Amino acid sequence: MIINKFSLKWMLAIAVAIPAIALLFVAFTSLNTMSVMQAQSNSLYANTAAPMRAMAEATSRIPRMRVGIDMMLLQETALKDAKGVLKRVEEARTEDIPEMRQAMQVAVDSQVNPELKEQARKLQARFEQMVREELEPMLQAFANNDMTTAQNIYRDKYAPTYGEMRKQANQILDTLLQQAEQQNHASVESFEAGRTKQMVIIAAGLIISFITSLVIITNLRSRVAYLKDRMSSAAANLSLRTRLELDGNDELCDIGKSFNAFIDKVHHSIEEVAENSKELATMASSVSQRAHMTQSNCASQRDRTVQVATAIHELGATVSEIASNAAMAADVAKQATLHSGEGKKVVGEVQNRIQTLVNELDNATQVVSSLATQINGISSTLDTIRSISEQTNLLALNAAIEAARAGEQGRGFAVVADEVRTLASRSAASTEEIQQVINRLQTESTRAVEAMEKGRSQSDVVVEFSAKANQSLTEINSQIDQINDQNIQVATATEEQSTVVEDINRNVEDINQLTTETSHVADELSRASASLQRLSSQLDKLVGSFEL
């Protein structure tokens, strides 16, 4: 519709302008009618009031003059008055005739209509003729007391002329009255025409205004109903595919365009949220796998730690046995001369035991080194977990921002994003705690390795001394003092080894405890990843409720 090309402001302006224009036309018509009526009224006044008053004055003097003449005629009868004939003749000449002339001249001058002016002039000329031919002779006869002549003139000339002049004057008055009636009728017709024109303009303005307003209101109602239905449908179905298609340039089209832009942005945001949710689910699954792997590695490490502890306990028993044997060797040294052969066997046994100790120390060193390697692996895994936690936190922050943009519809998604961010923060904190434990575990592992190396060095020394003892058995009788010194050294070394073994045992127990804690952390991480997967699933459901 062409009306849709106008804005609401212009529609309302048109709806108001039409009756306003109609009112202007009514006002213009009223002013025009009033102007015409005023002109007609002025014309009626100019053509009627003064001319009729002057003509009426002149007409009224005609019978008054006759009354004066009649009174002259009655002076010969019983009806005579005190003035007498001569007095009345004088009054007629000095007053009645001049006043009649003046009235006739005023009547002629006051006429506006040329035809009436001409008739008034004829009446004036007839009066002058009557004065010359009838009144003057008749007045002269009255003055000469010639009543017979006066009566004859009165009867034969003046009376017919009087009737003729009365008739002419009445005709002029009738014409003036007809003219006034015509002008009044024209004024009434102008009034009726103006009123009819005003009624037509008012009716046309009202009809056009009603039709225009009806068209505007119907169009607005249909367009508003379309907006309401489409928006209600989109809100009820959570459809992000809904678009408002309105033609025109009014504000409703602007609302439709703004709504479409809003839906496009929300659609894009929900699609990004869906992609991020899938990526979050993948990361949660990866974190869960890493957590299970960490838990498995912790279990394996715990088993190996138990093995190391067992070996350390055996090493401690061996060291104790070496110490006991060293004490026995001190006693037996006194009898070395008699038991040199037996001493060789003892020395050989000592060598075997020491070699076993060396092997056990090597195994312990390998186990501890493997433990350090596993710890480094755990540290790398924790770095991965920390990176995942940071990415999860970042994704949760982005999700919260997008939820805030979504407004009321993204409130549930904002709660989910906040829960994900909280879990990511807890995972990061747990990762930092695990990192601290691993750092302590690495330190203790390093110390354990150093202690193992010292023990191995001492074992090498013992092996060397045992070899020398085996070689010196032939000289054992002469070197008993030296053997006693060596036994003392062996006792001292075994005591140191016992101390080192106890330290290693404690370190292994600490490692075992740390491994247990790491396993618990891995369990929590696994549960956190499961919760993250559950939240991701809920997020997918929320996203799935939208029609993309």
From Swiss-Prot:
**Which GO-annotated molecular functions does the record name?**
transmembrane signaling receptor activity
Record's CDD domains? MCP_signal
Supply the alphabetized keyword list.
Cell inner membrane, Cell membrane, Chemotaxis, Membrane, Methylation, Transducer, Transmembrane, Transmembrane helix
What range(s) does the HAMP domain occupy? 218-271
Give the record's GO biological process terms: chemotaxis; signal transduction
Ranges in a coiled coil: none
**Predominant location of this chain?**
membrane
> Which stretches are Cytoplasmic in the membrane topology?
1-10, 221-548
Q: How does it sit in the membrane?
A: Multi-pass membrane protein
Q: Where is the Methyl-accepting transducer domain?
A: 276-512
Q: Does the keyword Cell membrane apply?
A: yes
Would you say which domain of life the source belongs to? Answer: Bacteria
Q: Name one GO cellular component term.
A: plasma membrane
Q: Which residues cross the membrane?
A: 11-31, 200-220
Record localization: Cell inner membrane
Q: Which residues lie on this side of the membrane: Periplasmic?
A: 32-199
Q: Does Acyltransferase count among this protein's keywords?
A: no
Q: Which family does it belong to?
A: Belongs to the methyl-accepting chemotaxis (MCP) protein family.
What is the documented function of this protein?
A: Chemotactic-signal transducers respond to changes in the concentration of attractants and repellents in the environment, transduce a signal from the outside to the inside of the cell, and facilitate sensory adaptation through the variation of the level of methylation.
Annotated protein name in UniProt: Methyl-accepting chemotaxis protein HlyB
- Organism listed in the record: Vibrio cholerae serotype O1 (strain ATCC 39315 / El Tor Inaba N16961)
